[in-house]
Amino acid sequence: LGISKSNLEFFNNKIINIDKIIWKLKKIDIFSDNLKNERLLNFENKKDQLFSILKNFQLYNILDKSLKKNKYFKMININEKENFLESYDIVISTDCSSPITKKYFTKQILKKYDSFAHTTIIEHKKIINDTATQIFTKKGPLAFLPISNNKTSIVYSILNSKNCKNEKIKDLIHDYNFKYKIKKINNVESFELKSFSLRSYYNHKFLAF
């Protein structure tokens, strides 16, 4: 995940401090496949970070642990409490795949983009790793997002690549890498790119966010 400096400050001050799980980036370089190693754009803040990178599961674990300690928070398994909804004047659903959303918000808009995002983490020789890199390749955008001085997250979005083999993705990463001395490319995970929205966000006492 990427988070801007202002949003990070808000999160730390108003929700919970997450400084221990972020990696600060001071620069973004943008390249084009046609111009080889010539920069199209670059954004830089030499004194402070432009934004930060963090792992989704680490953020989830911190929030989950904090909520469980909160005396005002209670976790309920709705599969075990069939009639619990009747006890509330307002019910808010924040999960598009939850039983509440599926039952009370049936009019939905799903758009598919015929693209898949392929993600992995590369392990490489230690460097000062505070610059994110985006390359607009002929196959789609490829992002190198540092998460430590010797590890970098990769996100490669490729059109019509549902059946693209992991070894092919790894070969493309090697082809476009001009910065890191890669020691290992970890397992590649693939996700279909699509957007989901509701036609209505309220239904009687039920709200969706």
Feature names for model-found ranges:
Residues 30, 144-146, 201:
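A structural signal for short hydrophobic beta-strand segments in well-ordered beta-sheet cores
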Residues 192-208:
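FAD-binding beta-loop-beta segment adjacent to the flavin cofactor pocket
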Residues 13, 22-105, 110-118:
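Conserved N-terminal helical subregion
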Residues 1-22:
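N-terminal glycine-rich dinucleotide-binding loop that anchors FAD/FMN and/or NAD(P) in oxidoreductases
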Residues 96-193:
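Conserved FAD-binding catalytic core of PHBH/FMO-like flavoproteins
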Residues 2-5, 44-65, 161-167, 193, ...:
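Short beta-strand to alpha-helix junction loop
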Residues 52, 149-152, 205:
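Short hydrophobic/glycine-rich mini-motifs in sensory/regulatory modules
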Residues 72-78, 187-196:
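Short gly/ser/thr-rich secondary-structure transition/capping motifs
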